[in-house]
Amino acid sequence: MNLACKLLASFLLIFFFSSKGAVSKKNITILGALERDINLDIPAFQMSEHVEDIQWSKGKTKIAKFKNGSMTFQKDKTYEVLKNGTLKIKHLERIHEGTYKVDAYDSDGKNVLEETFHLSLLEMVSKPNISWSCTNTTLTCEVTKGTDFELKLYLNGRMIQKSPRKVIVYKRASNQIASFKCTANNTVSEESSSVVIRCTEKGLDIYLISGICGGGIILFVFLALLIFYISKRKKQNSRRNDEELEIRAHKVISEERGRKPHQIPGSTPLNPAASQPPPPPSHRPQAPGHRPQVPGHRPLPPGHRVQHQQQKRPAPTPGTQAHQQKGPPLPRPRVQPKPPRGATENS
């Protein structure tokens, strides 16, 4: 009997202390997503008439109080205590990470519940972006946001690669038609993208085609501008050449006009004998001053010859006279005195 009583007493003591510790304190870890709302639910707790006051605190700072069915204290609008005692935190940010504690009291002010929560926040993953190249037979899966996530790549429903990094690069064996799915997930979120790739062996990559088209357009614009520039330069050069030819023509004409002597109309040449035609070859040259005798004509005496020559010589025109006066004065012929008639007859 004594041994049985001792065993029973030991069992009751162990159960009492263990149950008391479980009710009094629990450290619960909760993961939340940034920019989302979260509820801190009290496990195995149900509101009753005996519970009068519920207080929530973060660290040593009281943030909310619920008493007699209504909110009596609220640090800011981010925190709210629901009717079942749950704490709701709106639009989570990094400052909301930490340890939260809840205490429940009955009408006598006795603490009937005490729980502790540790809140950790994670960034939600973004939707994966899948890109590929038919030329290089490569496929890339990439995410831009997320913490503590895992990236997985599936080919025709079968997982072929996974990585904790933000990028997965997969080298395909051929350009056959294939279905790919990329999934990114962490504890608080999950996103996925799917694509069906159709590449032919002799096909061109869309980026290569776009590059060729863009290069052709740039080349066409360059050639058009070059042709326009060349035609414009040709027009300017032809116009300049025409102007130079016109200036040269005016210059030549003005020089030719300056070289020609100023002739006065009605003037006679200085040497009338030079303008006369040469005598026929049958005529022999005669001595100067000898004139052919006409039959039946009597030669005049020397005095009469001089007078006769002076009468036959035409009077110089004003233009010729002016032209002759420019040079040195010409010698004037001597006029022999007429011999008396008696002397001529006696001789």
UniProtKB/Swiss-Prot annotation:
Residues 58-70 are annotated as: CD58 binding region 1. It comes from the Eukaryota. Residues 328-340 have a biased composition (Pro residues). Residues 124-199 form the Ig-like C2-type domain. Residues 252-347 are annotated as: Disordered. Gene3D superfamilies: Immunoglobulins. One of its GO terms (biological process) is natural killer cell activation. Coiled coil: none annotated. Pfam families: C2-set, V-set. Its main location: membrane. Interacts with CD48. Interacts with CD58 (LFA-3). Interacts with CD2AP. Interacts with PSTPIP1. Interacts with FCGR3A; this interaction modulates NK cell activation and cytotoxicity. Residues 25-205 are extracellular. It is found in: Cell membrane. This is T-cell surface antigen CD2. The chain crosses the membrane at residues 206-230. Keywords: Cell adhesion, Cell membrane, Disulfide bond, Glycoprotein, Immunoglobulin domain, Membrane, Repeat, Signal, Transmembrane, Transmembrane helix. Glycans are attached at residues 27, 68, 84, 129, 136, 185. It is a single-pass type I membrane protein. The keyword Cell cycle does not apply.
